[in-house]
């Protein structure tokens, strides 16, 4: 029979038991403290407005406050308002939308009872980007969408752009990506082609008399412009994805050439001697990310006294970095001031001012996506 001394080699001593108990208590208290500690201070508040969406791309509001949301799979959802849990009034499904990688139903703009959308469509003959128009009825229903003819825009699985806005002069602005066409094809530098451009047309698709090239093109040399925003004074700002460097924010000028594929940021994107001119031929961005890129997407200027000293600042959403970036604007110069909601909600795409002076965002995580409302 083993003695108690022999068994003691395997039996825990009182000191061992005490150490274990203390360690468990320390770990438990640390976990409880972590759970009770508040989140790092956020200077803005976000709440969910709608959930359960499938790749929501953009958000628009009617004059009476109804909220319209595009889903990339080809749906437009009409809600009674931008309030949390507002009722769904209507869902419209757009035929022939081609959903592949980045393509599908994208931008939306609402002006009066007119609803404009930008979609990548394949009717079996051609794959194109199209501008479509519908009428919003009092009950929230939408008439069948019809194409607004503005010219051929090549569709593709990547680089569609498709930001839409209507300005105070009732011009419709549409950004169109370069469709990932070969750089040697130089679509973004060809003012006779609509890919790789920001377009400006009348609401019926006709060409404004003061457009710089006599067609729909307002500016050129863009890669994948997914954000358009009007500053309080009316200036138009554009946000686009770079390659592996230099996402850009540009102040648009009529006829302005923003460089792609020849120059991005302040640097050459690579020698293409047959299509590239001098660096001085191109307009430098107001801001560029350098390397790495952030995947900048939607953009909006903050309007309303509720934003305090942020009023007039530019907010840009990012997909890859999963946050918002706040920029101040002084004498035409942008300064990155702050990062908001860092990786709190995942990928962020749409950034839209609502009629209540709140900021509305869409997530782009691929499952159970949401619309968020941000206030300060």
Briefly describe each language-model feature range.
Residues 48-54, 92-100, 148-156, 216-221, ...:
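Surface loop/turn motifs at the tips and blade-to-blade linkers of beta-strand repeat domains
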Residues 48-74, 294-302:
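Beta-strand-rich domains and repeat architectures in extracellular enzymes and scaffolds
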Residues 61-64, 110-113, 166-170, 230-233, ...:
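Residue-level detector of Asp-centered blade-edge/turn motifs that repeat once per structural unit
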Residues 68-92:
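Beta-propeller domains
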Residues 69-71, 117-118, 174-176, 238-239, ...:
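Residue position within the beta-strands of beta-propeller blades
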Residues 85-112:
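Blade-loop segments of beta-propeller domains
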Residues 103-105, 178-338, 346, 356-360, ...:
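Beta-propeller domain segments
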Residues 128-166:
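Asp-box/WD-like beta-propeller blade repeats and closely related beta-sheet repeat scaffolds
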């Amino acid at each position: 029979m083993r003695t108690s001394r022999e068994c003691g080699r395997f039996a825990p001593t009182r000191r061992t038991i005490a150490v274990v108990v203390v360690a468990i208590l320390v770990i438990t208290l640390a976990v409880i403290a972590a759970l009770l500690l508040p989140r790092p201070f956020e200077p803005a508040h976000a709440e969910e407005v709608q959930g359960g969406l499938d790749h929501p791309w953009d958000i628009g509001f009617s004059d009476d406050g109804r909220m319209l949301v595009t889903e990339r799979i080809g749906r437009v959802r009409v809600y009674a308002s931008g309030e949390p849990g507002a009722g769904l009034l209507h869902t419209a499904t757009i035929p022939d939308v081609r959903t592949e990688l980045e393509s599908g139903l994208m931008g939306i703009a609402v002006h009066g009872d007119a609803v404009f959308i930008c979609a990548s469509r394949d009717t079996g003959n051609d794959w194109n980007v199209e501008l479509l128009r519908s009428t919003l009825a009092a009950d929230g229903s939408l008439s069948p969408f019809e194409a607004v003819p503005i010219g051929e825009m090549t569709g593709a699985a990547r680089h569609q752009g498709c930001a839409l806005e209507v300005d105070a002069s009732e011009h419709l602005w549409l950004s169109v990506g370069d469709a990932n066409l070969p750089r040697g094809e130089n679509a973004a530098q060809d003012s006779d082609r609509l890919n790789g451009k920001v377009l400006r047309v009348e609401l019926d698709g006709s060409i404004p008399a003061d457009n710089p090239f006599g067609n729909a093109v307002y500016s050129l040399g863009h890669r994948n412009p997914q954000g358009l925003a009007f500053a309080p004074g009316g200036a138009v700002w554009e946000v686009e994805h770079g390659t592996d460097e230099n996402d850009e924010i540009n102040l648009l000028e009529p006829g302005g050439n923003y460089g792609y594929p020849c120059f991005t940021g302040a640097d050459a994107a690579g020698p293409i001697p047959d299509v590239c001119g001098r660096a001085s031929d191109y307009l430098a961005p107001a801001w560029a990310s350098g390397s790495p890129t952030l995947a900048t997407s939607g953009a909006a200027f903050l309007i309303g006294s509720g934003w305090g000293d942020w009023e007039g600042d530019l907010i840009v959403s990012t997909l890859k970095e999963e946050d918002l970036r706040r920029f101040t604007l002084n004498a035409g110069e942008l300064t990155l001031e702050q990062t908001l909601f860092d990786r709190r909600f995942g990928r962020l795409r749409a950034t839209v001012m609502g009629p209540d002076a709140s900021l509305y965002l869409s997530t782009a995580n691929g499952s159970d996506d949401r619309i968020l409302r941000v206030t300060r």
